[in-house]
Swiss-Prot record:
This is Tyrosine-protein kinase transforming protein Src. The phosphorylated form is termed pp60v-src. Belongs to the protein kinase superfamily. Tyr protein kinase family. SRC subfamily. Residues 267-520 form the Protein kinase domain. Residues 1-58, 530-557 are annotated as: Disordered. One of its GO terms (molecular function) is ATP binding. The lineage of its organism: Viruses, Riboviria, Pararnavirae, Artverviricota, Revtraviricetes. Gene3D superfamilies: Phosphorylase Kinase, domain 1, SH2 domain, SH3 Domains, Transferase(Phosphotransferase) domain 1. It comes from Avian sarcoma virus (strain S2).
Amino acid sequence: MGSSKSKPKDPSQRRRSLEPPDSTHHGGFPASQTPNKTAAPDTHRTPSRSFGTVATEPKLFGGFNTSDTVTSPQRAGALAGGVTTFVALYDYESRTETDLSFKKGERLQIVNNTEGDWWLAHSLTTGQTGYIPSNYVAPSDSIQAEEWYFGKITRRESERLLLNPENPRGTFLVRESETTKGAYCLSVSDFDNAKGLNVKHYKIRKLDSGGFYITSRTQFSSLQQLVAYYSKHADGLCHRLTNVCPTSKPQTQGLAKDAWEIPRESLRLEVKLGQGCFGEVWMGTWNGTTRVAIKTLKPGTMSPEAFLQEAQVMKKLRHEKLVQLYAVVSEEPIYIVTEYMSKGSLLDFLKGEMGKYLRLPQLVDMAAQIASGMAYVERMNYVHRDLRAANILVGENLVCKVADFGLARLIEDNEYTARQGAKFPIKWTAPEAALYGRFTIKSDVWSFGILLTELTTKGRVPYPGMVNREVLDQVERGYRMPCPPECPESLHDLMCQCWRKDPEERPTFEYLQAFLEDYLGILAWTPWEDKQEGPRGETASNKQERPGEDTLAADES
């Protein structure tokens, strides 16, 4: 595994210097033509929430319901009403004969959006017609179509994106406020000797007349004009806006239209990534076009009928911190096709070369991401049953996603179902689940506490020196693992809350996510790849003074 610097080497990542039009405005202005959203100060932080896909009734074009949610986690936002012409946010290469290839910026007429996540569209550029992923487009001339608009991402996620050391000062994005519906926030990367890389968040307020402003002395009729102005003038910001924050293409919802139960021949197994008691994991390609991960299960591991029934539920779980289930081969040997995560399992990542460079802020951030995914599982009334570092996958920029949720329930191996054999993860399992088979979201919380020890010890096996039977006996008598070396007591206290004997006294994942994100906020953020210099070689000796720095109040809460 190489460095986690995220250089945009391919067209799937978007970075560009901003060259705005001359649209400076001062004083009052008429209302913007962008969707009317009531902006309010982003005054304080609240625990972040998941943004899974909202199910809606199918509808023919003629109009959009403004309560719809764009499924891309980094381009979320309400679709504009009455719009049938959309613009492409990313390049897309067709994967099947019925798909439509298109380029970023291409305008598309939507013909039919009643068939789920893949819409029938007609390109106004090429004249061709085919199916497109709905989260790759946005209504033409809307704020959702702006490259700098990231919609409904959390404050923490915006910081994760902006704190990439490759980003120069002034890299920015505009997002929805977490605290006030319809409000916006401008998030800007900065650098100084005291804090190193950091992010400033500025409230974007709304005028009664419909305009927008950060400071009342400089007002704009639209967010586009506000961004254009501050790309030329810092005017009280920490730095003028320079580059739009780079981001990768989102995952499509499924491989293609109607690609769920797929033929085994459509998959090519290329690189073996790992092997476990019940099968193997491969990097591979679907249909000769799409990189995927493929989990192959040994015959007899689980009933194909039970698996297919469970998979129908699993594919409906959609969250940016869950590994997306793409497709299945439902006849034995069962194949499970998911999105590919480039850095492999969290356990291998922690124990590998990159693990030694991880500091407490990165570890807490990874834990918060996992808690975010599990908070969604909690809200959906689902249970993972096998939460541990081996079942968390890592991507670029230390993105973590929960994998293999729900599969443990289906395993039919006698040694596993007895819950005592070597194949069963006793050390991660809550006592009521290990002894009596009572698996609930609260037993997942117990497992999360064990996972926290894996993070803080860089992948050490829990309960070192103890065998499974001894662990079960000792835990039943009240033993809990002591605080790992170099782990703050406050984090160990959180682990102990997860290990309370009464499941109902354990915290929720919603609480765990909020605690970890708030805890991360009080840590001095150490950027991935610890550097002594600022972005793009800016050091204390060559850093120039920034006139008017921080004359506008950034929301640091």
